Amino acid sequence: MAGELIKEAESNMKKTIEVVKKEFASLRAGRATPALLDKVMVNYYGTPTPVNQLANISVPEARLLVVQPWDKTVLPEIERAILKSDLGITPASDGNVIRLAIPQLTQERRAELMKVIKKKAEEGRVAIRNIRRDTNEQLKSQQKDGKMSEDELKRSQDEVQKLTDRYIKEIDSLLSTKEQEIMQV
């Protein structure tokens, strides 16, 4: 029973790491990546639809994204959605494709991004700690109900703590990698 709770906690912690990775990938660090457009939603026949479901997104150069819609009629809508997004990128359209030149990051924008990624990392750490707390509470209630001994409880809590430490360390590692990426001129 304790093993199942620990496996569930680890699974939830892995999901938290994936969320943090996605959050970091969607932040512009001066380099073009299709993940930048993951959160951009286009009003497609009245339905909010992600850009990557309406177009092919390619990276021909380090600072250039090319968005090639499969349906040319949706091109103006994609352009509008990119303008409305908080990416700080102005789309240039030639009627067939949209080109997004990724500008060099300013010092202010870098500082802003640093704050954002630190906040996202802290949210990830808090989520992992909450998973630890919930798992420990479930373990304690099992011990109270007589389903496990105090030694088993202590062993299980130590295992949950090791998982917590490991995944928080992983978030810290992701954070430092992203910080280096942002500070790279």
Swiss-Prot record:
A Pfam family it matches: RRF
Presence of the UniProt keyword ATP-binding in the record: no
**UniProt KW Glycosyltransferase keyword:** no
Q: Where is this region: Disordered?
A: 136-159
Gene3D superfamilies from the UniProt entry: 3.30.1360.40, Ribosome-recycling factor
- Record keywords, A-Z: Cytoplasm, Protein biosynthesis
Residue ranges annotated as transmembrane are none
Q: What is any one of the record's Gene Ontology cellular component terms?
A: cytoplasm
Which Gene Ontology terms cover its molecular function? ribosomal large subunit binding
**Where's it found, cell-wise?**
Cytoplasm
Query: Which GO biological process entries does UniProt record here?
Result: translational termination
Q: What is this protein's function per UniProt?
A: Responsible for the release of ribosomes from messenger RNA at the termination of protein biosynthesis. May increase the efficiency of translation by recycling ribosomes from one round of translation to another.
Q: Which HAMAP family match?
A: RRF
NCBIfam families in alphabetical order: frr (TIGR00496)
Can you tell me which family this protein belongs to?
Belongs to the RRF family.
Q: What is this protein called?
A: Ribosome-recycling factor
* UniProt source species: Pelotomaculum thermopropionicum (strain DSM 13744 / JCM 10971 / SI)
- By which gene is this protein encoded? frr
